[in-house]
Design a protein with these regions (language model features):
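Eukaryotic scaffold repeat domains enriched in small/polar residues
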Residues: 1-378, 388-389, 395-428, 433-444
Length: 444
C-alpha cells in the first residue's frame, strides 16, 4: 500500500467505481485512506476543514462515496456523520437523530455503517439501535426508522410475558428483554434496494435481507430444499454446532456486497468464511477461514468486490486479502450469464464443464434443468432438477409435461370427458329401452 503508518484496526472499505479508488476507514488511526486501482495510497484524510476550523475524525467505523465523489464518514465517537470532499473540506455535519424512541439517559449515538441513495437520503446502521436502520434526508434531518427486524412470538416469549404479570418492578428489571436484533451492516444496490445483514437472529434465519422502499424483506428464496433440518433462508454455515463448553457457535455476518450480476457476497466473522449466493439465495461458493496461512484471516471485518476480485479486510492484521476468480468460478458465471441472456443451448456446455470438475455442484444440475425447461424438454428437466434437489423446479417441469401431454391429446381428453358425462344418462336410457323391448316380446 505504501503507508508509512500501517492500518490499525480498520473497520470498513468502499470501492468507488467512478474514480476506481478504494476508501478505507482506518478506525484506530482516525483517518480515511484512499487507494488507487493498483492499491497504492493516493490520499490520506486525517484532518477536516470546517469553515476555517481544523477538526478530526474520532474512530470512524464506516465510509461511503456517492456518485459525485462526496465522501460520507460514520464518525463514530464524535457521534455524527461527516460529509466531505477528497481534500477534507467539510460539506455537511449530521448529528444524532431526534426521536422519542431513542430518548434515554443510556443512549449514545454511535453510527457504524452507512449508504446514501441517489436522492441524497442517508441510511445509517448505529450501535444499540434496535428499531431498524436510521434514515436521514439530505439535510441531515431524521425521517424514520427503516426495515426493522421483528421479534417472533415463541413459547419462551409468551411464558416470559405471563410471568411479568406476577412480578415486582425489581424482578422485571432483572429479566431478559426481548428486542429486535440490530443490523450489522448494509449495502445499496444500483436499483435502490438496501441489502442488510444481521449478525445474529432469533431463529438463525433471514440473516441476509433485501429491503424495499416500504421496509419489507423481498429477497427471493427458491426453497428447493426446505425441510425440517434445512431452510434456504438460513444463510451461512449449517447446522449450528456446540463447543465443548456447550456454547452455540453460529454464523455471524459482519458485512456484505451485492454486484450488478445479482450475486450476494457475505462475510462471516465467526469462522472467517466468505459466502456467495445468487439472487434466489442459492449458495454458490464458500472460501476463506480463520488462520495464519494464505487465504485466511485473523479478524475479518469488511468485504468488497472490484470487477471479479473479492477483497476482505482484516482489522487485526491491518491487511487486505484479494481473491482472484478461478477458471471454475469463471465457467459457472459464464453459464449463468448465458442463461440470463436467453442463450439456453449455449449455457449447457459450460454447465457440463462445471460438472466434470465437480459432480456435486447442485447449481449446475439446476442450471441444466432450467435450460431444458426453456427448450420444453421436460423429462430431461425433471431428471436434472432431481439431481440438483430442486423440488420446485421438478414440480414445475412435471406440471409442464402434463400440460404438454394434455395439449397433444386434447381431442381424446374431450371425448373421454363427454363419455364420462353422458354415461349417467345413456346407460339408464339403454336399460329402459331394453326393458321396453323385452316387454313387447313378452306380450307375444
Amino acid at each position: 500500500m505504501g503507508l508509512e503508518d500501517p492500518l490499525y484496526m480498520p473497520q470498513d472499505m468502499f470501492y468507488h467505481k467512478e474514480t476506481k479508488c478504494l476508501y478505507i476507514a482506518d478506525t484506530d488511526n482516525s483517518r480515511i485512506v484512499v487507494l488507487n486501482h493498483d492499491y497504492q495510497v493516493v490520499k490520506i484524510i486525517d484532518s477536516l476543514n470546517y469553515d476555517g476550523d481544523i477538526e478530526s475524525f474520532s474512530s470512524p467505523y464506516g465510509v461511503y462515496v456517492d456518485t459525485d465523489g462526496a465522501i460520507y464518514v460514520a464518525d463514530t465517537k464524535n457521534e455524527r456523520i461527516v460529509k466531505c470532499d477528497l481534500e477534507g473540506n467539510v460539506l455537511g455535519l449530521f448529528g444524532p437523530p431526534s426521536s422519542p424512541a431513542l430518548e434515554s439517559e443510556d443512549f449514545r449515538y454511535q453510527p457504524r455503517k452507512l449508504v446514501v441513495d441517489k436522492d441524497g437520503y442517508i441510511y445509517v446502521q448505529a450501535q444499540h439501535v434496535y428499531q431498524g436502520i436510521l434514515c436521514f434526508d439530505r439535510d441531515g434531518n431524521f425521517v424514520q426508522f427503516f426495515g426493522s427486524n421483528r421479534v417472533d412470538v415463541t413459547a419462551e416469549l409468551l411464558f416470559e410475558q405471563m410471568l411479568r404479570v406476577f412480578m415486582t418492578r425489581e424482578q422485571r428489571s432483572k429479566m431478559l428483554t426481548f428486542v429486535p436484533m440490530e443490523y450489522s451492516n448494509l449495502y445499496l444496490s444500483q436499483k435502490g434496494f438496501i441489502y442488510a445483514v444481521t449478525s445474529k437472529t432469533q431463529d438463525s434465519l433471514n440473516e441476509i435481507k433485501k429491503i424495499n422502499t416500504n421496509g419489507d424483506n423481498v429477497l427471493r428464496v427458491n426453497s428447493y430444499r426446505n425441510t425440517a433440518s434445512y431452510k434456504k433462508n438460513n444463510y451461512g454455515d449449517y447446522p449450528i454446532y456446540y463447543s465443548n463448553e456447550g456454547q452455540v457457535i453460529d454464523t455471524s455476518f459482519i458485512d456484505l456486497h451485492y454486484d450488478e450480476m445479482g450475486y450476494i457476497t457475505a462475510l462471516d466473522e465467526t469462522r472467517g468464511r466468505v459466502f456467495v449466493y445468487d439472487d434466489e439465495s442459492n449458495l454458490m461458493f464458500i472460501f476463506g477461514g480463520l488462520g495464519e496461512q494464505l487465504g485466511t484471516f485473523s479478524r475479518p471485518t469488511a468485504v468488497e468486490k472490484i470487477d471479479n476480485d473479492i477483497l476482505v479486510l482484516d482489522r487485526e492484521e491491518g491487511a487486505i486479502t484479494i481473491f482472484r476468480q478461478t477458471d471454475f468460478g469463471r465457467t459457472v458465471f459464464e453459464a449463468i450469464q448465458l442463461y440470463n441472456e436467453g442463450k439456453y443451448l449455449e449455457a449447457m456446455e459450460p454447465w457440463q464443464m462445471v460438472l466434470q470438475q465437480n459432480s456435486n455442484f447442485n447449481v449446475a444440475y439446476n442450471g441444466l434443468g432450467k435450460a431444458y425447461m426453456q427448450m420444453e424438454q421436460y423429462n430431461m428437466a425433471m431428471h436434472y432438477f432431481k439431481l440438483g434437489y430442486d423440488k420446485i423446479g421438478y414440480s414445475d417441469a412435471r406440471q409442464e409435461l402434463f400440460a404438454l401431454w394434455a395439449r397433444e391429446n386434447f381431442g381424446i381428453i374431450i371425448i373421454a370427458i363427454l363419455i364420462f358425462i353422458l354415461i349417467p344418462f345413456v346407460v339408464p336410457w339403454l336399460l329402459s329401452r331394453r326393458k321396453k323391448r323385452k316387454g313387447v316380446y313378452d306380450s307375444f
